[in-house]
Amino acid sequence: MKLHELHSAEGSRRNRKRVGRGTSSGYGKTSGRGQKGQLARQGGHTRLGFEGGQMPLFRTMPKRGFKNINRKEYAIVNLDDLNKFNDGSEVTVETLKENGLVKKELSGVKLLGNGELKVKLTVKVNKVSAAAKKAVEAAGGTVEVI
């Protein structure tokens, strides 16, 4: 196959509809807009959510909640992710990034107790759950909150 032999799939590309080009085209005169009325006019569409003057649904519902500007979001690492590391090694935020376990650091890294830890590690993270701390110490490792 050569570059000049490439073709797009059948039906994947469509010619644009050319309107106002004579009555025999099927889209002449009113250009597919019907007769007179709001929708035949330029800019004659209502805004999104407009229900013809009836009280719109989004205004009938009460407002709820708020966005906390002080919210801290942590990158999450589970115990079974830490089995990648060698026995006795030190796990920090930097080593987690290097191994692809943490993509974005956000406000820090939190260790959660999902899974089973099979290696002895020294873990240095920003936050740790009680179950995760217990599991790391049961495996013979230590947890340090930085």
Curated annotation (Swiss-Prot):
SUPFAM superfamilies: Ribosomal proteins L15p and L18e (SSF52080). Keywords: Ribonucleoprotein, Ribosomal protein, RNA-binding, rRNA-binding. Residues 23-35 have a biased composition (Gly residues). Gene3D superfamilies: 3.100.10.10. It holds the Pfam family Ribosomal_L27A. Residues 1-13 have a biased composition (Basic and acidic residues). PROSITE patterns: RIBOSOMAL_L15. GO terms for molecular function: rRNA binding; structural constituent of ribosome. Residues 1-55 are annotated as: Disordered. Part of the 50S ribosomal subunit. Binds to the 23S rRNA. Belongs to the universal ribosomal protein uL15 family. This is Large ribosomal subunit protein uL15. It comes from Lactobacillus helveticus (strain DPC 4571).
